[in-house]
Amino acid sequence: MAAEAGGGEPLVKFVKLSGRAAGSKKKVRWFPVRRLFTHSCPSLRIPSRFLREGRRSPPARSGHRCVADNTNLYVFGGYNPDYDESGGPENEDYPLFRELWRYHFATGMWHQMGTDGHMPRELASMSLVLHGHNLLVFGGTGIPFGESNGNDVYVCNVRYKRWSKLNCRGKKPNRIYGQAMAIIHGFLYVFGGTTGYIYSTDLHRLDLSTREWIQLRPNNPPCDLPEERYRHEIAHDGQRIYVLGGGTSWTAYSLEKIHAYNFETNTWEDIPTKPHGNLGFPAARRCHSCVQIKNEVFICGGYNGLVILGDLWKLNLQTFQWTKLPALMPEPAYFHCAAVTPAGCMYIHGGVVNIQQNKRTGSLFKIWLTVPSLLELCWENLLKYFPQLCQLPTHQLLQLGLSQELIERLK
């Protein structure tokens, strides 16, 4: 059986922004978007093939990914086997979501983005990172899980709303899903993942300048490599890549000791971490989320093989001290997605919230992981008490004293 793939507020408190509770059956009308063909590019079309009437947020889903900048949260892909929630017979990609959404922070509104080009079809447990104005997507699986995996890199420029497949050379990773990915020093690193049947401990690197893949061969003996895994997360400090959790269909790995890949020595190292007093260490988990702010890494939610977790932990990459934060997810989830803004606000969307009923949620929550700057506090209050700000023309915004950077966040 293939491995599953879908699966002014107070600080350190989750705030719900949008979304319907798991299992909501609100009827939605779906409208196909016409396909566009040209002689020069016969495959050109709008891949977000359905626009929804009366729905202001993405349907409940799991196995999707998200990234954030100062202005938007971008949510791509996902999976929901619930026939009605996924659009029924009018959704050609059921039970997957071949679509890209953005949540605009300034207005609190969701927008399904119409895009041109070649959107990937591997829509569950892919990897997604933000590089400038580009979304980079790698891997993932279609349906059935493990039978239609990907190993190409797709790029979507969010300004021009166009997808393209990156032409790469060299030794690409296998067709996998559930891998972890990060951009470090101009290289795209991919670690682990699964074919659906075989789990990986491979580490690959793509040079984003030359577009050449290589498989890194660490100097360790095979017995010293990390255990094969999927649905883990990675963090980095510029000198090492740190692997956090993950597992297989039958296990979840501990967070008491962390595997770290050393760039300089080309070796894997085992780094013990420090517990949070009597609270100890975070539970072993897979299918959790992870965001990083400088040298602090935050993990949230996940699944330990028995229960869905809703806790929030912080790891300092200089001291390797774990700290349990005094916040719990309002809807404990796994196979959810999370992203953090440059200002330090984390957004969490979707995920599986009930194992027995196989229910997913479409809820969106936010939580500040750092003390917001005075600018951010003033900005949030300005938007709260002057919501029509987004409707003003640029010259009026400039007259009000807004900087060009803040004006860009209104678009």
Curated annotation (Swiss-Prot):
Quaternary structure and interacting proteins, as annotated: Component of a CRL2 E3 ubiquitin-protein ligase complex, also named ECS (Elongin BC-CUL2/5-SOCS-box protein) complex, composed of CUL2, Elongin BC (ELOB and ELOC), RBX1 and substrate-specific adapter KLHDC10.
Gene3D superfamilies: Kelch-type beta propeller
InterPro entries tied to this protein: Kelch-typ_b-propeller, Kelch_1, KLHDC10
Listed pathway(s): Protein modification; protein ubiquitination
Placement of Kelch repeats on the sequence: 72-133, 135-186, 187-239, 240-288, 296-342, 345-388
Stated role: Substrate-recognition component of a Cul2-RING (CRL2) E3 ubiquitin-protein ligase complex of the DesCEND (destruction via C-end degrons) pathway, which recognizes a C-degron located at the extreme C terminus of target proteins, leading to their ubiquitination and degradation. The C-degron recognized by the DesCEND pathway is usually a motif of less than ten residues and can be present in full-length proteins, truncated proteins or proteolytically cleaved forms.
GO biological process, one term: positive regulation of stress-activated MAPK cascade
Pfam family, one: Kelch_4
Homology family: Belongs to the KLHDC10 family.
Keywords from the UniProt entry: Kelch repeat, Repeat, Ubl conjugation pathway
Name of the protein described by the UniProt record: Kelch domain-containing protein 10
Organism field: Xenopus laevis
Gene name as annotated: klhdc10
